[in-house]
Amino acid sequence: MRAVVQRVTKASVSVDGKIVGQIEKGIVVLLGVGKDDNIDDTKYLAEKIVNLRIFDDNDGKMNLSLLDVQGSALIISQFTLYGDCRRGRRPSYSDSANPELAKELYEKFIELVRGYGVHVETGIFAAYMQVEIHNDGPVTLLLDSKKVF
């Protein structure tokens, strides 16, 4: 399972011109599910993300987590995180999970993050979305449950 985590001052996601999710201070999580992922990957990333110390403390050091600052999370599915661009010019998505598994683990990830007491907004799984992100810093991190990077 892969995630792009961005610290934001605000963010929103729209489908067909209508906002379906929006947050103020917090994080945007673009989440991709791989074909070999399971519940353990979901648990690992959820715990890791809510506890990442990427928010500034009073001394201006990144020392506080999403939980510490009581921030929100906007979680959006993004299968293209498994795009393999090593050969040719068109990405291959053969490492992405099938839609059924991807939806199941995406929804479980949302449930787990909410279980930490985080206010969560979401996009719509498999929909064509427009995402507006006001990246704060900018702070952008790449995470992989298999620790590839």
From Swiss-Prot:
Chain span(s) of sequence motif Gly-cisPro motif, important for rejection of L-amino acids: 137-138
SUBUNIT field:
Homodimer.
Enumerate the CDD domains for this protein: Dtyr_deacylase
Where it sits in the cell: the answer is: Cytoplasm
Q: What is this protein called?
A: D-aminoacyl-tRNA deacylase
Q: Write down the EC number.
A: 3.1.1.96
| Chief subcellular location | cytoplasm
Q: Which reaction does it catalyse?
A: glycyl-tRNA(Ala) + H2O = tRNA(Ala) + glycine + H(+); a D-aminoacyl-tRNA + H2O = a tRNA + a D-alpha-amino acid + H(+)
Provide a GO CC annotation, any one: cytoplasm
Functionally, this protein is described as follows: An aminoacyl-tRNA editing enzyme that deacylates mischarged D-aminoacyl-tRNAs. Also deacylates mischarged glycyl-tRNA(Ala), protecting cells against glycine mischarging by AlaRS. Acts via tRNA-based rather than protein-based catalysis; rejects L-amino acids rather than detecting D-amino acids in the active site. By recycling D-aminoacyl-tRNA to D-amino acids and free tRNA molecules, this enzyme counteracts the toxicity associated with the formation of D-aminoacyl-tRNA entities in vivo and helps enforce protein L-homochirality.
Q: Does the keyword Transmembrane apply?
A: no
Protein family? Belongs to the DTD family.
Q: Which InterPro entries match?
A: Daa-tRNA_deacyls_DTD, DTD-like_sf
Q: Which gene encodes it?
A: dtd
Keyword Thylakoid (UniProt)? no
Top-level taxon of the source organism: Bacteria
Record keywords: Cytoplasm, Hydrolase, RNA-binding, tRNA-binding
The Swiss-Prot or TrEMBL record annotates one GO molecular function as: tRNA binding
User: A biological process (GO) annotation for this entry?
Assistant: D-amino acid catabolic process
- Domain notes for this protein: A Gly-cisPro motif from one monomer fits into the active site of the other monomer to allow specific chiral rejection of L-amino acids.
